[in-house]
Amino acid sequence: MADYWKSQPKKFCDYCKCWIADNRPSVEFHERGKNHKENVARKISEIKQKSLDKAKEEEKASKEFAAMEAAALKAYQEDLKRLGLQSDISEPTISPVTNTVQPTPTANQQKEKKKKKKKKEASKGRWVEGVTADGHCYYYDLVTGASQWEKPEGFQGNLKKTAAKAIWVEGLSEDGYTYYYNTETGESKWEKPDDFIPHGGDVLSSKDSEKLPDTLEDSKSSDSHSDSDDEQKKAGEASAETKKLIIKFKEKNKSTEKRIGPEIQKEKTTPKQNPSNTNEEKPKTPKKSTNPYGEWQEIKQEAESQEEVDLELPSTENECLSSSEAGAGEIKVVFKEKTVSSLGVAADGVAPVFKKRRIENGKSRNLRQRGEDE
């Protein structure tokens, strides 16, 4: 049988990031070591610090949400004061938010809630009448969620229901998300409650607000002859109470534009009674809308003066003169030449002769030669 080599099993330590032999004595010896114990203690402290940081972040987020709710309630109170209405809502005390996990509803509970919701909607009726902030009546469909200005067929007056005080109020957060606020308990949540009834303070779509001009005038003229004085008083009371539930957190200028829009269109629709007076009247200049960034200003370029300015630039005449003077002022250098008449006379009277270097044995002296001893 052939011999073969089998490797010893090894184990990786996650704390020390090293490999050790996978047997009981080696593992116990490594775990009893000082370095391993220090690494384990360091890892535990890191996990503890991370959990503390996470708890601090959650506590900070809960405080920020509580501050947002308080600011929303404060803005709501200011809007009511600006509109001259009294609020029956008392400012709720902000309690620290605890991180509690709500039990998830079972399927049976959800089915029961849906059945109760359907029964409530069937008992209330399909259409509900509401009043906007401007005092205009609109109709809301509980089944489809659609709203319209025209009175639906077979609708019976439901002003008493809209005039009743609602518990839940719909609002918009700073990010544009809708949430629901309980006026009695001060609770707020993102999901739509079961007993929520839409009111005039709810946010309408821009398409519904554009249908205001003509349909409202026709419906008012037709309903004014049929309705009695008592119904008008009830409608006024209902509009006054529903105005209390209006919450406007973003783009407050939109409400003023919506109010100005119908008034301008009414002035256009009214016939001209005295044409002579209108000709005499001067056209009114439209009011300039205030811009937070300021108004545009036209920049006018000033005509540059054509006065000659002395830039003190060098003239060409001076350059020509300087070049001519430089050419004339050049000095020629004369070099002296020295000639050697003779190389000298030796003592014997024989002229010196240049001798060639002798080469030993036909080899030059600058090359290293092997000596005799070598």
Swiss-Prot record:
Composition-biased stretches (Basic and acidic residues): 188-197, 205-270
Basic residues: compositionally biased ranges: 112-121
Annotated region (Interaction with SNRNP200), positions in chain: 355-373
UniProt xrefs under InterPro entries: Matrin/U1-C_Znf_C2H2, Matrin/U1-like-C_Znf_C2H2, U1-CZ_Znf_C2H2, WBP4, WW_dom, WW_dom_sf, Znf_C2H2_sf
Regions of compositional bias (Polar residues) in chain numbering: 91-109, 315-325
Keywords: Metal-binding, mRNA processing, mRNA splicing, Nucleus, Phosphoprotein, Repeat, Spliceosome, Zinc, Zinc-finger
Protein name, per record: WW domain-binding protein 4
Biological source species: Rattus norvegicus
Gene it is expressed from: Wbp4
